[in-house]
Amino acid sequence: MVAEVQKQAPPFKKTAVVDGIFEEISLEKYKGKYVVLAFVPLAFSFVCPTEIVAFSDAAKKFEDQGAQVLFASTDSEYSLLAWTNLPRKDGGLGPVKVPLLADKNHSLSRDYGVLIEKEGIALRGLFIIDPKGIIRHITINDLSVGRNVNEALRLVEGFQWTDKNGTVLPCNWTPGAATIKPDVKDSKEYFKNANN
């Protein structure tokens, strides 16, 4: 099974570092919630801690939207635990509020299409999975550029809005902004107001 937008997310069960201990984490555990699954290439590297720390610091915002952030790496759970024990000022993570999944056999990275086989590391994939287990969004960055927490949160809020209200969202939409009724006639209301 390969991850695709509008398809069921590949299931997984992995050992994770959660609040300083090891815990088995599965996608099934979060059924009924949105899941933001993000992959990082390597523990103790450079861009990765900035991403995990930023998403961890924003964990409450995602929780308030009924979403759980998960990070996955091809490192072992022991490496990930050691990384959380290293202070942030030294390039570590310190305590984090998001589970860190150990994908040491690379099955998760492979199933989600982010594994660089030759190097045994993952590209910076970000997947938004809805409460029914359907993938709604995929982005995959090269190794050198980190992701944007606010954009990930905006996408979760956007998918939730469209699911609830049946409207579609224009470019650069933010919560509270105008939406579009997906109908040839009714959509004209949006375009009339947007182009005055």
UniProtKB/Swiss-Prot annotation:
- Species of the source: Saccharomyces cerevisiae (strain ATCC 204508 / S288c)
Record GO terms (molecular function)? peroxiredoxin activity; thioredoxin peroxidase activity
Membrane recorded as keyword: no
Q: What is its main location?
A: cytoplasm
Its protein name is Peroxiredoxin TSA2
Name the GO terms of the biological process aspect. Answer: cell redox homeostasis; cellular response to heat; cellular response to oxidative stress; hydrogen peroxide catabolic process; protein folding; protein stabilization; response to oxidative stress
Q: Where is this cross-link: Glycyl lysine isopeptide (Lys-Gly) (interchain with G-Cter in ubiquitin)?
A: K14, K89, K132
Q: Which Pfam families match?
A: 1-cysPrx_C (PF10417), AhpC-TSA (PF00578)
Family, according to the entry, reads as follows: Belongs to the peroxiredoxin family. AhpC/Prx1 subfamily.
